[in-house]
Amino acid sequence: MTTTPILILSGKGKTGRRVAAQLDRRGVPYRLASRSSERRFDWYDESTWADTLAGVDTAYLAPPVGPTGLTQAGKFIAQARGLRRLVLLSGRGVGSPGRDFAVYDGQLELESVVQASDLDWTIVQPAWFAQNFSEDFLRYHVLAGELRLSTGTGAEAWIDTNDVGDVMTTALLDPAYVGRVLPLSGPRTLTMTEIAAELSTAAGRTISYVDLNPEAHVAEMLEQGLIQEDAEAVRDLFAVIRNHRSEYVSDGVEQVLGRPARDFTDWARETAKTGVWDQ
């Protein structure tokens, strides 16, 4: 078992928290890195990078969403002296047709930086996280009773972030996954109308889907406090769903963990019990 801590960037995000919890259960030391951690880390402040890397040789990296943040993550990897093992969180379908957007270009460039490095790398490419509806910006929509989004009639195989965390942890600790790209998804695809129906059943009240055109969606995200670059990144990520480019299932969870990925229905039912959608 490793005696040096595994670095988790960004350690307080949805996947980072779950990787940390799994490492805790296994007795593996780790170091959380974020703007509010003991060793302050900021993607946009390069003076924080060296101290964060001191004394570690293995890292899990969850980069920022927007193109600027992805560029910074690439610079960080290029300067990561002493690092030898890296597991990177990317996005499903990076490099595939129909993804001619800046955010996908940034993800593809970052993957290329990792693959061209001297690191022992693994790239994990999950579908959209189900927990966006309970822990992130989509929770607001559920509480409001309307999913005001721009995915049209396209479908996505939404994945439980706990499955992603389990795969990430396994990849960090098992050298069998060095040099591999692991696409992950839930067990079936769902349109946003179907998602709304699932959430309605789980929450015990009506939640509907309101389809916005992409630019109207950007305008609403800006009103909700997102910066322009991040709002445009979300728009472009949703455009892939809208254009029916994400309607397939990936079996990476079963390949790595030896069990099926958790279904959205089961996730929604259990999540509703926590009260996160109560009004």
Language-model features, listed with the residues they occupy:
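Oxidoreductase cofactor-interface core, primarily capturing Rossmann-like NAD(P)-dependent enzymes
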Residues: 2-32, 36, 44-47, 54-57, ...
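Residues lining the SAM
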Residues: 9, 62, 258
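A hydrophobic C-terminal alpha-helical subdomain
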Residues: 215-279
